[in-house]
Design a protein with these regions (language model features):
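An N-terminal, well-structured beta->alpha segment
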Residues: 1-77, 172-213
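Gly/Ser/Thr-enriched, mixed-charge loops and adjacent short helices
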Residues: 2-10, 120-270
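Buried hydrophobic positions in well-ordered alpha/beta secondary-structure cores of metabolic enzymes
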Residues: 18, 56, 96, 109, ...
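N-terminal small/polar loop signature for handling phosphorylated ligands or for N-terminal nucleophile
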Residues: 42, 50-122, 228-290
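Active-site nucleophile and cofactor-binding loops and adjacent substrate-binding regions
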Residues: 84-93, 295-298, 326-328, 349-351
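A short, gly/pro- and small-residue-rich
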Residues: 120-150, 290-305, 382-393
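Glycine-rich phosphate-binding loop plus the immediately following alpha-helix
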Residues: 132-163, 300-323, 327-337
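Phosphate-binding and adjacent anionic-ligand microenvironments
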Residues: 270-276, 280, 289-292, 312-555
């Protein structure tokens, strides 16, 4: 029954911060995808694949359904006892985490390249989540990579006919092996309703007919989740949804919720004077929040949610408040100020949601976020776009009980009056020459001593420190090095340089700019930060090393 297929190692099958991402044509090479799937099962944490239950689903992009069938056959040959698979291969990343935890599965395989474009000419990805519902830690991804380097064969059962992914219920290809097709929305909606005050939000909506919502799923996986939660559960009109049909190529667009790629939402929110506009990405773990008169940066969004959560959100009230807060290193320090005021621990971790998981499992972290439009809490072990949007609705509804006409803008201005404002922007230079970008980073690292004390921006900014961020996990002691170059100035302003690991080809240079102001909190962000941006380009000599004069995306 089991067929052993001989193969040899493929170059470059090293999982990044969010699994393995490559062009579709790379995954379509003979034995390429099968070899990586085998590596996942080979490296699966103890007790291993024998008798295990594994959740499988994806963001609906091209090639998902084909790979689901490969996973079923290879998993069966490696001893998996049960697969739990989202209908039609659909399962948002947050929902996959929720299903893993709710069904007490041994892990999950998520087929996504997140916010990267989809379709035959674009990207595909495979990531593995462990039994806590979170992304595999480096110990597991390192074991997977080691398995790819030693790959000589993979096991499969080709006699298993294609499973009907559209039919809910259990199918049993042979004794001792079952495939269960589940509603991809059900467990997630049940969890979300247990976290937030849906009755309060519904009452607010009915009492404030002028309040409008516009949710854009960017033709990614969250369309069905938005339909169920915003329309069927909370009662917003159908017109509150846009681009909510999952498409294999995301409608030919880039499913990344930022001001550049979600321009359709931005334009509609402004034109129609929408009260709360929101978008999610391809696999549903990212979010963007704005209104007709305010754009909320992700750094400010997580900080504001943390400020209000213990008072407004039932999940945190019933759990005795917040245990701790955290952010990725490049994310602005706004949430640090919330933690300080509320007497909470605040952790600074490398980019990659997996670094939050240990803190959550240890009971030391409740809410966290990344500047890359990722926000979440300890209800699951992934960032969660829908969660963040419903959190905003819950907060607006709660505050409106005592302050009528509460809006996104009024909430942010109130927040700044308490904490001051961390002005923040990010410049992305996508698909630049990797060699040139690497040389630029090496040169910056070489400046760690001789740049301190030098001034830039016409003398406005004096360097106090340059380092390459490293992180020692306070729970398991693991060390992560070279996580981003930080330049800190004597006024606490920061410039950070990173090479992203989420692209499928070339390199993406990200520059993060941050400046704090406790007095002038209503400036235009780009105007407030222009001197620091100029200093960043001067220090890095980015154009010289990459040939780029302008960023691909400004957030």
């Amino acid at each position: 029954m089991v067929t052993v297929v001989k193969t040899s190692p493929f170059e470059g099958q090293k999982p990044g911060t969010s699994g393995l991402r490559k062009r579709v044509v790379v995954f379509q090479q003979p034995h390429y995808t099968e070899s990586f799937i085998q590596a996942i099962f080979t490296a699966m944490p103890a007790p291993g694949p024998q008798g295990a239950t594994v959740v499988v689903g994806g963001d609906g992009r091209f090639y998902v359904k084909d790979v689901v069938q490969k996973i079923i056959r290879i998993g069966a040959a490696n001893g998996i006892a049960r697969f739990i698979i989202g209908k039609d291969g659909i399962l948002s990343t947050p929902a996959a985490s929720a299903v893993i935890r709710a069904r007490k599965a041994d892990g999950g395989i998520i087929l996504t390249a997140s916010h990267n474009p989809g379709g035959p000419e674009n990207d595909f990805g495979i990531k593995y989540n462990t039994r806590n519902g979170g992304p595999a830690p480096e110990s597991v991804t390192d074991a997977m990579y080691k398995a790819t380097l030693a790959m000589s064969e993979y096991r499969t059962i080709d006699s298993i006919a294609d499973i009907d992914l559209s039919a809910l219920g259990e199918q049993t290809p042979f004794d001792g092996f079952a495939v269960e097709i589940v509603d991809p929305v059900e467990d997630y909606v049940r969890l979300t309703k247990s976290i937030f005050d849906f009755d309060l939000i519904k009452r607010f909506r009915s009492e404030n007919p002028h309040f409008t919502l516009l949710f854009d799923a960017l033709n990614g996986v969250t369309g069905p989740y938005g339909q169920r939660i915003f329309v069927e559960e909370l009662g917003f009109p159908q017109s509150s949804l846009d681009q909510c049909t999952p498409l294999e190529d995301f409608g030919g667009s880039h499913p990344d919720p930022n001001l550049t790629y979600a321009h359709r939402l931005v334009e509609r929110v402004a034109k129609e004077r929408i009260s709360l506009g929101a978008a999610s990405d391809g696999d549903g773990d990212r979010n963007m929040v704005l209104s007709h008169d305010w754009f909320v940066t992700p750094s400010d969004s997580v900080a504001l949610i943390a400020h209000h959560a213990a008072d407004c959100i039932p999940y945190f009230r019933s759990n005795g408040g917040l245990r701790g807060l955290a952010r990725s290193m490049p994310t602005s320090c706004a949430i640090d100020r919330v933690a300080q005021r509320k007497g909470l621990e605040c952790f600074e971790v490398p980019t990659g949601w997996k670094f939050f998981g240990n803190l959550m499992d240890a009971g030391r972290l409740s809410i966290c976020g990344e500047e890359s439009f990722g926000t979440g809490s300890d209800h699951i072990r992934e960032k969660d776009g829908i969660w963040a949007i419903v959190a905003w609705l819950n907060i607006i509804a709660h505050v409106s009980q005592t302050i009528p006409n509460t809006s996104v803008r009024s909430l942010m201005l109130d927040f700044f009056s308490i904490y001051g404002r961390n002005y923040f922007t990010r410049y992305d230079y996508e698909e630049v020459d990797a060699a040139g970008a690497g040389k630029m980073m090496d040169r910056l690292r070489g400046h760690s001593t001789d740049i301190v004390g030098k001034s830039f921006g016409g003398g406005a900014f004096t360097v106090a420190k340059l380092d390459d961020f490293e992180y020692t996990d306070p729970i398991d002691g693991s060390l992560s090095i070279k996580q981003g170059i930080r330049i800190v100035f004597d006024d606490s302003s920061r410039i950070i340089f990173r090479l992203s690991g989420t692209g499928s080809q070339g390199a993406t240079v990200r520059i993060y700019i941050e400046k704090y102001d406790s007095i002038h909190c209503d400036q235009d962000t780009q105007e407030a930060l222009k001197p620091l941006v100029d200093a960043a380009l001067e220090i890095s000599r980015l154009e010289e090393f990459t040939g780029r004069k302008e960023p691909t995306v400004v957030t």
